Amino acid sequence: MGALGAFQMDRFLWISPCLWYLILGYSVGFVVRHRGEKILSGLMACALMLVLGATGFTILKNSDIKSNLQKLRNPEYPLLSYSDYYALGVLDQVQSFLQDETGMSQEEYRVVSLGIDPAAALYHGFYCLDGYSNNYSLEYKHAFREVIAPALAESEYLRAYFDDWGNRCYLFGSECPGYYTIEKNGFYFQHLELDTKALRALGGDYLFSSAYIANSEELGLKLLREEPFETDDSYYRIFVYEVADE
């Protein structure tokens, strides 16, 4: 299949709003042009309202508005809220801790995330080596691949996902393939696969993990604080590891 194998037909949905506006404009024009024909224009107006109403209901039903309202009504609703996703109140603690611990500002070190979307760290002003992007150099992809190569070797799913696509330039673990957000539910990495030498060569200083890493010392990671960073109602608990020098 080549390049077609990575093509996602659902991306067509990105231009669907434009198509709906074109249909709306055409429909309004049709009603205006035939406003003298009461029956025809009335039927068209009814059809237009029906389509717009159904579309609006579908958007509301499947949008983030619904999940956020559900989350406000029931904190146990199994979808991430805005504060959950961005780890509000948690990564603020991490930032303050590293400032006190190292005396360095955020631009002086680089971080990666495990089990938490890198966007959360980026949102809090951290300088990230990982992220979700469809526009970064092939050279960087190859360099980052060295960091996660041990995990890719253990999971064909992860290997194909990164090598054949690669927009998610994330840390992966074969113990939980396909899970990019790990809730504080007792899960921990028993044997994380990670090349910390390659991570250090890439400039990585700290790793934020939403799960405890049992083999951290073996990997060359130093847990900076035994107690994880969290709040009473946070989705994540974050362990901060320092990447050892080569």
Features from the language model and the residues they span:
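Membrane-helix boundary/interfacial segments in multi-pass membrane proteins
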Residues: 1-22, 27-28
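Extended, basic/helix-rich recognition subdomains
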Residues: 15, 36-42, 46, 209-219
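Residue-level marker of positions within ordered structural domains that often coincide
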Residues: 20, 33, 212
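Signature aromatic-anchored transmembrane alpha helix within multi-pass, membrane-resident enzymes
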Residues: 29-64
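Extracytoplasmic
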Residues: 60-246
